[in-house]
A protein has these predicted regions:
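Short, charge-rich amphipathic alpha-helices with coiled-coil/heptad character
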Residues: 7-31
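Intrinsically disordered, low-complexity terminal tails/loops enriched in metal-binding residues
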Residues: 15, 78-79, 105, 117, ...
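Long, hydrophobic, amphipathic alpha-helical segments used as structural scaffolds
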Residues: 21, 57, 61, 85, ...
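Long amphipathic alpha-helical coiled-coil segments
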Residues: 73, 92-109, 121-125
């Protein structure tokens, strides 16, 4: 098969991938986040605090108390963002998509390394982040 044909077929499969329930749910969760006014306000507060923090730490006469206050505000707002129901749903959906992408990468790697892509096991309870993992071998 020619290189162009392989790329074209891969693009066709990638287009079909967008129909996978995991990607559909991720898109819905992203839209929920966009429509969640409470979450959007928290994100605005976080961005403003981050901006103010960056300005303060670059000042020649930086106010340590102000930096601490802004850092506390950043951490508190970040925690509120991550506790938001819409954000939690999004993160759960994103973790599933990340696991799917990892699986697809492993299939491609098996083929590239002369392995059998059909024998690549599907990740079990994998969040795609290997730090702290006991080692699934993927």
């Amino acid at each position: 098969m020619e290189k162009f044909d392989i790329i074209h077929e891969f693009k066709v499969l990638a287009t079909k991938l967008k129909e996978d329930d995991r990607l559909v749910y991720l898109k819905q969760a992203r839209n929920m986040n966009d429509m969640d006014q409470e979450l959007q306000e928290l994100i605005r507060r976080f961005n403003l605090a981050q901006y103010n923090y960056q300005i303060e730490i670059t000042k020649d006469d930086m106010d340590e108390a102000k930096v601490t206050e802004l850092n506390d505000e950043l951490q508190d707002t970040y925690s509120q963002i991550m506790e938001n129901d819409s954000m939690q749903e999004y993160n759960a959906c994103k973790a599933e998509v990340d696991t799917l992408v990892l699986y697809l990468q492993n299939i491609i790697a098996a083929a590239v390394n002369d392995g059998d892509p059909m024998l690549v096991p599907e990740p079990v309870d994998c969040n795609g982040v290997c730090a702290g993992c006991s080692g699934c071998g993927n």
